[in-house]
Amino acid sequence: MYDLLKTIDDPAALRRLDRRQLQPLADELRAFVLDSVSQTGGHLSSNLGTVELTIALHYVFDTPHDRIVWDVGHQTYPHKILTGRRDQMHTLRQLGGISGFPKRDESEYDTFGTAHSSTSISAALGMAVASKLKGDNRMGIAVIGDGAMTAGMAFEAMNNAGVEDDVPLLVILNDNDMSISPPVGALNRHLARLMSGRFYAAARAGVERVLRVAPPMLDLARKLEEHAKGMIVPATLFEEFGFNYIGPIDGHDLDSLIPTLQNIKELRGPQFLHVVTKKGQGYKLAEADPVLYHGPGKFNPAEGIKPAATPSKKTYTQVFGEWLCDAAELDARVIGITPAMREGSGMVEFEKRFPDRYFDVGIAEQHAVTFAGGLAAEGMKPVVAIYSTFLQRAYDQLIHDVALQNLPVVFAIDRAGLVGADGATHAGAYDLAFLRCIPNMTVMAASDENECRQMLYTALQQPNPTAVRYPRGAGTGVATIKQMTALPLGKGEIRRETSQPAGKRIAILAFGTMVAPSLAAAEQLDATVANMRFVKPLDADLVRQLAETHDAIVTVEEGCVMGGAGSACVEALLASGVTRPVLQLGLPDRFIDHGDPAKLLAACGLDAVGITKSIRERFLLSGAVGGQSSVKRVA
């Protein structure tokens, strides 16, 4: 099995194959991807759709000398397999295993790290310009999907690239949202070869030289050319950016891909190749439902993904989706906004019930935030459902367009904290730190499902921008109360009180997901636990009260320590004039790799065992409780 694939340990071996062997190789590679992902979980549909394109790129271009940048990067499993990582695929997205995205420190073939969308053209352009300046004759190649192509950053890069006449840049649009009928496919195969050929390029340049003496005639000739292309191919928009547009061609047809890429390799200046592929190609179940098979867990390929048993605990995403529908039922001003994450953010039901108030703005986080600001300015109640890691992309809009004008936009921040298999690129480690420093912001962290629901309702009542953060996955099992009640603004609650005498009293100030492990640790230590609820406005009175009645303070958060919730507590203590030893626990000052979330939290010392150990080492074993004032960060 996989006899041909087993001979390919790097692209050099691939390039030694006869062209007639490439389709059998593609069949083996697709089968290997399916078999591998079914055993580990991961992204499937997108990878099944890029098999032939990946083979063609490594066959035609001299990788890694020529640089391929894969936008988003979750479609790179065939690339990883062909570049020496076939035997590591069983470790995919696991602790200590290979990443599900390109990583520069994993392979020289991963020329640029990606995971967020629409960055590839900028990176490939930078590489191509560097090649031009150094004279090392390498091609910069960006492979970008039709969804990522909608983002502003992609067009900013296109606009910049179009003025670089002789830069060795190729942008490949991997369009998997349309299909080519056989007649059109045959016509476009012929057209792509024609438009990417040397004769066409030379003739085009010659006509331009002749007509340059008569600018009106040159403009007319260009318009006629665009019109001729426009009759049989889409997207002459890219010609306006200064690219030579080629395609669309069938991205599963190696006999079309390879000669077209070989022709493009000989051209200079920015080239744009439109390739049409199908998500889930070659696996009927994924072809029929590419969304279901986008990022599955382990499954039996022969049977497909079976409906999961109803879980005993709701996910926080489900809690948000139910709340949003309930809120919209009560108030016609409630608007739901997502930047291309309808399923992931739990908004499927909202779209069905309130289609006129549902807005999927595409992969455009900056626009999503300012769009929400405009709605809020006109009296609507916009709710932006966004992953923590993607909110980073709209930070200026958050400050300039929403907070500065004190507009009441609700930010429902999903995937806060560590996210597991997707790794550092998707971790929500920084939102507490970057939100709490913004004037006019209210910031809450949910400790369980019902608190999340009530916090979202509280946020909707505020006259200012408000954020509620909650983690990926299942909650704690707490039932949600249908009745929605606003929480007292900026007030935490005591969840457990110590029975220790003076001199041994420790108070743990826990935020969001860290309340549960802090309570478990407190049982071992007999410590007080406060569920702080609000990061901003912080319950400074509660912080001061606990400091006055305890001998040491511990802050615990699933976020970066520097500038985070613990820092807010230290600032409050300093302002109150009460000094106590403080231990700040949180995510370390490094990027956390992929792996099982529970194992990652344990490795960071943020499970009950780790919290207990850190407190004992800092205070109880060292005898620091009751000693001189100090602050220590454990991260």
UniProtKB/Swiss-Prot annotation:
- Which of this chain's residues are annotated to bind thiamine diphosphate? 74, 115-117, 147-148, 176, 283, 365
Q: Quote the catalytic activity from the record.
A: D-glyceraldehyde 3-phosphate + pyruvate + H(+) = 1-deoxy-D-xylulose 5-phosphate + CO2
Q: Supply the gene name.
A: dxs
Cofactor note as given: Binds 1 Mg(2+) ion per subunit.
GO MF term list: 1-deoxy-D-xylulose-5-phosphate synthase activity; magnesium ion binding; thiamine pyrophosphate binding
**Pfam families, from UniProt?**
DXP_synthase_N (PF13292), Transket_pyr (PF02779), Transketolase_C (PF02780)
EC number(s) stated in the UniProt entry for this protein: 2.2.1.7
| InterPro entries reported for this sequence | Dxylulose-5-P_synthase (IPR005477), THDP-binding (IPR029061), Transketo_C/PFOR_II (IPR009014), Transketolase-like_Pyr-bd (IPR005475), Transketolase_BS (IPR020826), Transketolase_C (IPR033248), Transketolase_CS (IPR049557)
* Assigned protein family: Belongs to the transketolase family. DXPS subfamily.
SMART domains linked to this entry: Transket_pyr (SM00861)
Role played: Catalyzes the acyloin condensation reaction between C atoms 2 and 3 of pyruvate and glyceraldehyde 3-phosphate to yield 1-deoxy-D-xylulose-5-phosphate (DXP).
Residues annotated as binding Mg(2+) are 146, 176
Which cofactor names does the annotation list?
Mg(2+); thiamine diphosphate
What is said about its interaction partners and assembly? Homodimer.
The name this protein carries in UniProt is 1-deoxy-D-xylulose-5-phosphate synthase
| GO cellular component terms, A-Z | cytosol
Keywords associated with the record: Isoprene biosynthesis, Magnesium, Metal-binding, Thiamine biosynthesis, Thiamine pyrophosphate, Transferase
Pathway annotation: Metabolic intermediate biosynthesis; 1-deoxy-D-xylulose 5-phosphate biosynthesis; 1-deoxy-D-xylulose 5-phosphate from D-glyceraldehyde 3-phosphate and pyruvate: step 1/1
An example GO BP is:
1-deoxy-D-xylulose 5-phosphate biosynthetic process
